[in-house]
Amino acid sequence: MTNLNYTPTIWTRADALKVNENDPTTTQPIVDADFPVMSDEVFIWDTMPLRSLDGTVVSVDGWSVIFTLTAQRNNNNSEYLDAEGNYDITSDWNNRHGRARICYWYSRTGKDWIFGGRVMAEGVSPTSREWAGTPILLNEDGDIDLYYTCVTPGATIAKVRGKVLTSEEGVTLAGFNEVKSLFSADGVYYQTESQNPYWNFRDPSPFIDPHDGKLYMVFEGNVAGERGSHVIGKQEMGTLPPGHRDVGNARYQAGCIGMAVAKDLSGDEWEILPPLVTAVGVNDQTERPHFVFQDGKYYLFTISHKFTYADGLTGPDGVYGFLSDNLTGPYSPMNGSGLVLGNPPSQPFQTYSHCVMPNGLVTSFIDNVPTSDGNYRIGGTEAPTVKIVLKGNRSFVERVFDYGYIPPMKNIILN
């Protein structure tokens, strides 16, 4: 279908050594421990604003809509009560991934979110977990394609179509009752479960390339090959100073940002392409990749963790970015290292799962925040929105907004 001939860009160990966790221009401001919670009934984490295929965050008939990974808070479940009857929120929070469901919320203000409920009825999704993706408003009739990840057993990129309906009172969803599997890891470009039981393959983010008008998708993957078989050569190392050439067990880290191209704009058939960016020997996770198109350039963002860095490297939980003049690269790591917005060292787990929107606003969720008594408070709710400014290959934190502030960039009046 496509003659895209390109070589993946390598995020090198030398690049990652430049990560500076103490640079205030790339550090997310402190989240206070007295943060508000969206719901006492559910946890939320990965947030997916409704958008168009060019990345524009949209509202419908004046209603903003977000989709979230969601799990019930089991505060009355005996499984999560200790001997004194106290709720063990930490265990409940840590176990959320196994029961993740995609739900939706709506708002007139771009905050003050109202819970709408499940997107898909129980049993519609063919696997036990509904993991993150991207909801796309297709037209003024209110049709939505929700691209997401079907997980356990396996991991498959999929989509499900439904419709958004509005009234003066709120928003409802209809349809979303037939899931279409699109593709799984191929073992040629992207690692499969048989090659690595800890493989990553998820987080579809479709988009129209502003240059050629075709429909593409980026997603998280790992570079194909048996676990531990990857070689960290000169290209993966980059130009390293003395004392930094021992890679330890870095061969186990093989994250990449994958890409696929659709046969047509329906998005029903896809061809898997080589990765855009690889992180062999650097990091094992490049989650929730997504593009911002600005000034004729391609800003490719992803999120990653401190704990998924390879031996000899470190960096904060947060957003990492790469810049190119072309869709297929080559890409250069933003700010020299790739780090765009990281948690502060004093609160390394305060936020995660950032989504950079074309207006520079960055949404994320609160994970856990230290408290004055030396403990910590679990979040499971929206974090304060941060604005960053992109200037060529550099980025700067500029402002903090309210919790969960995700304003629309465009309002669509439905037919």
From Swiss-Prot:
Catalytic residues as annotated in Swiss-Prot or TrEMBL: 46, 287
GO BP terms, alphabetized: carbohydrate utilization
Cysteines paired by S-S bonds: none
Residue sites binding sucrose per the record: 45-46, 132, 202-203
CDD domains linked: GH68
Keyword GTP-binding annotated: no
pH dependence: Optimum pH is 4.0-6.0.
Temperature dependence comment: Optimum temperature is 20 degrees Celsius.
Catalysed reactions listed for this entry: [6)-beta-D-fructofuranosyl-(2->](n) alpha-D-glucopyranoside + sucrose = [6)-beta-D-fructofuranosyl-(2->](n+1) alpha-D-glucopyranoside + D-glucose
Origin: domain of life: Bacteria
One Pfam family cited in the UniProt record for this chain: Glyco_hydro_68
Matching SUPFAM superfamilies: Arabinanase/levansucrase/invertase
Transition state stabilizer (site feature) positions: 203
Enzyme Commission number(s) of this protein: 2.4.1.10
Keywords: Carbohydrate metabolism, Glycosyltransferase, Plasmid, Transferase
InterPro entries with a match to the protein in the record: Glyco_hydro_68, Glyco_hydro_beta-prop_sf
GO terms assigned for molecular function: levansucrase activity
Function: Catalyzes the synthesis of levan, a fructose polymer, by transferring the fructosyl moiety from sucrose to a growing acceptor molecule.
UniProt similarity note: Belongs to the glycosyl hydrolase 68 family.
Name listed for the protein in its UniProt record: Levansucrase
The organism of origin for this protein: Rahnella aquatilis (strain ATCC 33071 / DSM 4594 / JCM 1683 / NBRC 105701 / NCIMB 13365 / CIP 78.65)
